[in-house]
Amino acid sequence: MIDEATPLLRVRGLTKRFQGRRGLEGHLAVDGVDFEIARGETLGLVGESGSGKSTTALCVLRLLEPTAGSVEFMGRDLTKLSSRELRGDRRHIQMVFQDPYASLDPRMNVGEAVAEPLRIHRIGTRSERRRQVAELLDLVGLRAGSAERYPHEFSGGQRQRIAIARAIALNPQLIVCDEPVTALDVSIQAQILNLLKDLQDRLGLSYLFIAHDLGVIRAVSDRVAVMQRGRIVETGRADEVLARPAHPYTRALLTAVPVPNVLEMRRRRSVWKEMRTLRASET
């Protein structure tokens, strides 16, 4: 039995080196990363493109094999599990990708896509899976009739809702969100972020939330870890780190506003204003 005080996920010394060609040294993408995620918590992992965020996530899931380090999830070190053992643990840890269209098989209708994890793990009869798909679609704000349609018939935001429905189908404990709103329109970003927060409250989910947009990280994270060149250079409560950054790289991220500055600031204000409005309308 796992103590509730034990972190859901504990990563220690996680390292990933990609081998170079013809005996060359290769690239150290993740360099001794440590972090923890508590039950029901969101850890925001932020950094520039190429900082190692997504590689870290893939190593946590063992979609990439770590070079060194440990990934303890629910008290078990995933790096030491066999493929068969890992398959069972993957029921409890899922991923939502940046591009919802690429993550959905265009040959499957929505019902088949959402039910696929249930079918793979042999959960329920066909009729039971259909009922569960309808419940999952309702949970993410889509009509049950959506199950018969195909991914290309939906907008980007709706496709991300479908991907989220599939991610929660197995009642996971942890969801890794890799830039889940980056490809979406501004108004839709706020809706998806609110959906993720609502699901967290309802289902007790934990998130490892990866983003390069500090505004997004500020809105969704309990704690934040700042990543630079494969290392975590600063970590702490999101409000404290983003209000009083200690590391020069974190300060640089906070002061770096893409051109054109005015348009970018307006865009960010629009997203967070809409998020506050949506949350207020639900209470």
Give the residues covered by each predicted segment.
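Proline-centered turn/helix-capping motifs that create local helix->coil transitions or kinks
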Residues: 260-265
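ABC transporter nucleotide-binding domains
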Residues: 1-256, 268-283
